[in-house]
Amino acid sequence: MSKTEVRLRQPIVVVLGHVDHGKTTLLDKIRGTAVVKKEPGEMTQEVGASFVPSSVIEKVAQPLKGIIPVKLEIPGLLFIDTPGHELFSNLRRRGGSVADIAILVVDITEGFQKQTIESIEILKDKKVPFLVAANKIDRIPGWRPIENETFTKSFRSQSQSVQKALDNYVYKLVMQLAEMGFNAERFDRVRDFTRYVSIVPVSGKTGEGLPELLALLAGLTQQYLKTRLRAVEGPAKGVILEVKEEQGLGHTIDVIIYDGILRKSDTIVLGGINGVIVTKIRNILLPAPLQDMRMTRSGYRSIDEISAAAGVKISAPGLEEALAGSPLYVANDEAKLQEARKLIEEELSKVRFSKNSTGIVVKADSLGSLESLVAGFEKIGIPVRVADIGPITKRDLIEAELSAKEVEEYGIIAAFRVKPIPGLDTSKVKIIYNDIIYQLIDDTIKYIEDLRERRKRRTLDSLVLPGKIKILPGYVFRRSDPAIVGVEVLGGVVRPKYPLIREDGQRVGEVLAIQDNKKNIERATKGMEVSMSIKGNIMIGRQVQEGDVLYTDVPQEDLEILFKNYKDSITEDMMEVIKELIKIKKAENPLYGIFIQ
């Protein structure tokens, strides 16, 4: 490299994708390949990340020289060790993400699933470029695996039918990406990498396609992200991935440094549960090599300084309340300290808030997850009253109860990886727990929708009540469309819009209207003989015969509400109908009416 050339830092790479699509397997294979190909002293294990040096990438990509020219200016690639949404949400920086590029892992045989689509939405929102690893090619029927081979060579050795099957799978991914607004193509058919998302068929299990994946990651980042990757000599900037208590070290923070140089003598500024934390670094730590483990009781070795991009553990006083997802700035003079303090205060107030308005309470364990949850709820129109970090407190319960007084379904707490403080009575407030961001949002939506639905059905008139009728022989006025018949009510209640079933549980239609002495009536009870029109899948003489007995089709939820809120309204004859209904409905739902003693 000439003196005029700019030094580049290593790009930070994250791995996202749907559960069970092979994110961890692929990451493990990349790390394993790097270990096998490295020379002594070439590879450094970092905290929360794995650095794959350019020398290793060049060796792995050697067979592709004729197809992908690989002459790397970047020092290598820094892979964040933990894949998935939850950790990615903590890789926050102003205007986007600390991640420079992402690998979106998709099971080639399954295509896009819910979390795949969510991953793309997140990457789009954070403006992170990505390429698609179409994983599990070894699962394509008839695929003959060749361990650690390039995709190009392995693909050529497959039968024509297998090649065609793979192309069809890739085409489906192309179509799914097009639906989300992206041009995409298999990597070896892409001419303009700025306009097309590259799809790299790989196997995390056999290592096939890994050379192309690594070569593309390295090549694309150094070609198109040069300005972003320009190495900065100034004070370090980073983001806190995790806060941990380590034996012999106390509270520590795992940090990704994405800019500048971090030194052991530095003063750092970061976000804490109760505001900004200013502290002086005690130690910058990296994992000790295996042979040095005996020398360090903690399993870490101390270093004097490190340049971006890097994953390190920092030991310092006062880190007990440090927040995962918080920015971290080096500030060694008063002016820098005030500037950093202001930036972090702005970040904290943007994500943590309390409004005097109706909405749910959201509690999370980190700034990143809290930010993702609030954005997720607001996107689907669920307002947030309180967004905060840490365990659930009495104040949170009070806020939820205040919300419930205004809008019943908003009197809840959505809790991500946090629990109530010990001894807190939470019995009066619904708390929804989940350790997966998208699942917590889904669970909350379901609870709110169910509550709204239940509220609609609270009045007795809105319920389908138990009823039993008999079609009177000789009183068929019209056989179908709608059928009009004379009926006797044998028990319970029948109303217009009530669905009807036969004694075998088969749905036959819905009551359209009821007449008594040629006048429309809203209900018919035991002992009444009325004329009834029934619409739906019914023809007298085919699905239903004269003399047949029909029942109202009472949903399980309506029966529960009837017993819970309106038990006094249940007459003896209605109770008999309920018992008969339970016998009929249990054939398809063994739990139907289980709550009735």
Swiss-Prot record:
Keyword field: GTP-binding, Initiation factor, Nucleotide-binding, Protein biosynthesis
Database matches in SUPFAM superfamilies: Initiation factor IF2/eIF5b, domain 3 (SSF52156), P-loop containing nucleoside triphosphate hydrolases (SSF52540), Translation proteins (SSF50447)
PROSITE patterns documented for this protein: G_TR_2 (PS51722)
Gene name per UniProt: infB
Annotated function: Function in general translation initiation by promoting the binding of the formylmethionine-tRNA to ribosomes. Seems to function along with eIF-2.
The keyword Nucleotide-binding belongs to this UniProt entry's keyword annotation: yes
Family in the record: Belongs to the TRAFAC class translation factor GTPase superfamily. Classic translation factor GTPase family. IF-2 subfamily.
One Gene Ontology CC term in the entry: cytoplasm
Occurrences of domain tr-type G (ranges): 8-225
Name of this protein: Probable translation initiation factor IF-2
A molecular-function term among this protein's GO annotations: GTP binding
HAMAP family: IF_2_A
Region (G4): 135-138
Region (G5): 203-205
Record Gene3D superfamilies: P-loop containing nucleotide triphosphate hydrolases (3.40.50.300), Translation factors (2.40.30.10), Translation initiation factor IF- 2, domain 3 (3.40.50.10050)
